[in-house]
């Protein structure tokens, strides 16, 4: 436990509450002191949802310390059951309840005697896991509970759907553009002729968890949450899962190929690979089949329209998706739907070639962004990092060869010092890196949680799929400040004229700039002024000079 000015991953109970509040008609009760109940305010402010946050704090106060928690916790569970009639009440411990060594499982058992509602104690170790790990674990625990419950009641239907279907696991509240990504994933799956079976946990009911085995496969867009659930379903029902994040042109194409390959192999194993059998199941008219055969004869490449001719051929020919169909779809989407492919070859984007960047965020977004910047947009990534220390090995493997160095840390001062040391042209990180960039006057594009309210947009801004590629291209290009444009605006008194600000993370340098020194510094073009200022201050410190004049600037230049 440590006192921190900024945390990338919150305590474990925040992850549990994020999962619980993502489900519909699920109420969470946390046994915590005042101060730990900030989740309600945070979610209400950031998530921009109309519903109230379904979380109640069972406050640990002096009465609890004197008499024990059992009566208060059980009363809170019973009261919420009567008031809200939820499908599930999830009790989450906190660091405080762990310190007090409360037997919360006993409280849950006692409350269940008088209730018909399911009551679960979140099984997370608050001293060993962080917010994201706890969220992953809680989602798996709730899924396991309801699938085993359905097994006991004989209500578990593991019969696969007739048409290819998929579950999307890991979309939940306070995630980075998760709702927008989910819409884009549904569109992508629809293009491939795959229906969505369930989306867990965002907007789902716990009773629908028993339907998860009906799907053909699971799609996990983010490594942080959903992977444990997918592994559980793989172990119990032999359900394949795809964990490649479709972010960027290359990885989106890879994900599409994996999906089509998985569906093709499952079709063969399910025995739906013959035209006669599939024709009988889908009731496609002979007129439609004749139309498709004519389309197949003329396979000229052209932009896809709403009827999806290219994939329509593949689905209506009844066989598994062939590599030719998949590659044609990817080519059409890359050239006509995504604008990033041609934009990356344009003169505007070539201005970014060789620009230096630093990337930091959660493992999924930081790794994907590093690869996009390097191989798709021609930038030079000095350092790629993540605060997901538990996923460090996977992250290193993903970014190997795409950056100069790798940083695994949850200390914001470390990445801040790296940024100040390398002085990149742009930063791509979290809200904290945005603050650092403002202090150092380095532009920053936000690509990962934790973020503030401006990164919970009301408009449609996915980061996944082919539309997400367009959003990323805009973000990258708009994040960079064009040096000559800024310089010209300053020369002609444009709106970007600004005073020299302090650009070191430590403001107590003990140096004083004279008026003539500042005048000389202001003559330096804006896009290199900050670097010149830092170099002069560094020179002055080495020479034990306390006042920086124009002569000191000239001496630093000659040194």
UniProtKB/Swiss-Prot annotation:
Primary localisation category: plastid
A single cellular component GO annotation: chloroplast
Residues engaged in binding [4Fe-4S] cluster: 36
Subcellular location: Plastid, Chloroplast
Pfam families to which the protein is assigned, alphabetical: Oxidored_nitro, PCP_red
Gene this protein is translated from: chlB
Enzyme class name: oxidoreductase
Necessary cofactors: [4Fe-4S] cluster
Catalytic activity: chlorophyllide a + oxidized 2[4Fe-4S]-[ferredoxin] + 2 ADP + 2 phosphate = protochlorophyllide a + reduced 2[4Fe-4S]-[ferredoxin] + 2 ATP + 2 H2O
Protein name per its UniProtKB record: Light-independent protochlorophyllide reductase subunit B
Residues at the active site: 348 (proton donor)
Keywords, ordered alphabetically: 4Fe-4S, ATP-binding, Chlorophyll biosynthesis, Chloroplast, Iron, Iron-sulfur, Metal-binding, Nucleotide-binding, Oxidoreductase, Photosynthesis, Plastid
Binding site for substrate: 483-484
GO BP: light-independent chlorophyll biosynthetic process; photosynthesis, dark reaction
Entry's cofactor comment: Binds 1 [4Fe-4S] cluster per heterodimer. The cluster is bound at the heterodimer interface by residues from both subunits.
Family: Belongs to the ChlB/BchB/BchZ family.
InterPro entries linked to this entry: ChlB/BchB/BchZ, LI-POR_suB-like_C, Nase/OxRdtase_comp1, P-CP_red_C, Protochl_reductB, Protochlorophyllide_Rdtase
Assembly and interaction partners: Protochlorophyllide reductase is composed of three subunits; ChlL, ChlN and ChlB. Forms a heterotetramer of two ChlB and two ChlN subunits.
Cross-referenced HAMAP family: ChlB_BchB (MF_00353)
EC numbers: 1.3.7.7
Job of this protein: Component of the dark-operative protochlorophyllide reductase (DPOR) that uses Mg-ATP and reduced ferredoxin to reduce ring D of protochlorophyllide (Pchlide) to form chlorophyllide a (Chlide). This reaction is light-independent. The NB-protein (ChlN-ChlB) is the catalytic component of the complex.
Pathway it works in: Porphyrin-containing compound metabolism; chlorophyll biosynthesis (light-independent)
Domain of life: Eukaryota
GO molecular function terms noted in the UniProt entry: 4 iron, 4 sulfur cluster binding; ATP binding; metal ion binding; oxidoreductase activity, acting on iron-sulfur proteins as donors; oxidoreductase activity, acting on the CH-CH group of donors, iron-sulfur protein as acceptor
């Amino acid at each position: 436990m440590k006192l921190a000015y900024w945390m990338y991953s919150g305590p474990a109970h925040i992850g549990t509450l994020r999962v619980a509040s993502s489900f519909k008609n699920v109420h969470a009760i946390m046994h915590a002191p005042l101060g730990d109940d900030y989740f309600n305010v945070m979610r209400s402010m950031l998530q921009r949802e109309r519903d109230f946050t379904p979380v109640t704090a069972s406050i640990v106060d002096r009465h609890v310390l004197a008499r024990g928690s059992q009566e208060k916790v059980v009363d809170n569970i019973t009261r919420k059951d009567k008031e809200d009639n939820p499908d599930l009440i999830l009790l989450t411990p906190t660091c405080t309840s762990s310190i007090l060594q409360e037997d919360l499982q006993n409280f849950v058992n006692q409350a269940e005697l008088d209730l018909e509602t399911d009551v679960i104690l979140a099984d997370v170790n608050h001293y060993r896991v962080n917010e994201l790990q706890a969220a992953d674990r809680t989602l798996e625990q709730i899924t396991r509970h309801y699938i085993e419950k359905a097994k006991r009641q004989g209500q578990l239907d593991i019969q696969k759907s007739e048409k290819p279907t998929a579950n999307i696991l890991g979309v939940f509240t306070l995630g980075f553009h998760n709702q927008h990504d989910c819409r884009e994933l549904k569109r992508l799956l629809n293009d491939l002729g795959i229906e969505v079976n369930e989306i867990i946990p965002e907007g789902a009911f716990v009773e629908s968890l028993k339907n998860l085995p009906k799907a053909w496969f699971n799609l996990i867009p983010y490594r942080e949450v959903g992977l444990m659930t997918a592994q559980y379903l793989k172990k119990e029902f032999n359900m394949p899962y795809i964990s490649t994040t479709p972010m960027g042109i290359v990885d989106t194409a890879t994900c599409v190929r994996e999906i089509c390959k998985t569906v093709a192999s499952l079709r063969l194993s399910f025995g739906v690979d013959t035209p006669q059998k599939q024709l009988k199941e889908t009731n496609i008219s002979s007129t439609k089949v004749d139309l498709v055969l004519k389309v197949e004869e003329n396979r000229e490449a052209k932009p896809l329209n709403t009827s999806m001719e290219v994939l329509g051929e593949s689905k209506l020919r009844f066989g598994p998706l062939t590599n030719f169909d998949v590659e044609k779809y990817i080519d059409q989407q890359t050239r006509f739907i995504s604008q990033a492919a041609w934009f990356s070859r344009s003169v505007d984007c070539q201005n970014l070639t060789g620009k230096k960047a630093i990337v930091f965020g959660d493992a999924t977004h930081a790794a994907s962004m590093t690869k996009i910047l390097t191989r798709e947009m021609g930038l030079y990534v000095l350092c790629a990092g993540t605060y997901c220390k538990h996923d460090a090995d996977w992250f290193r493997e993903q970014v190997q060869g795409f950056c100069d160095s790798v940083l695994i840390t949850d200390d914001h001062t470390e990445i801040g010092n790296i940024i100040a040391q390398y002085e990149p042209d742009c930063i791509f990180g979290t809200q904290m890196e945005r603050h650092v960039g403002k202090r150092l006057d380095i532009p920053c594009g936000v690509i990962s949680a934790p973020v503030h309210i401006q990164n919970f947009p009301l408009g449609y801004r996915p980061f996944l799929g082919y539309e997400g590629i367009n959003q990323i291209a805009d973000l990258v290009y708009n994040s960079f400040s064009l040096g000559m444009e800024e310089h010209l605006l300053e020369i002609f008194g444009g709106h970007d004229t600004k005073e020299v600000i302090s650009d070191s993370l430590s403001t107590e340098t003990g140096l004083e700039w004279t008026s003539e020194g500042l005048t000389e510094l202001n003559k330096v073009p804006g896009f290199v002024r900050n670097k010149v200022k830092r170099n002069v201050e560094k020179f002055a410190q080495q020479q034990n000079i306390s006042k920086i004049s124009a002569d000191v600037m000239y001496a630093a230049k000659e040194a």
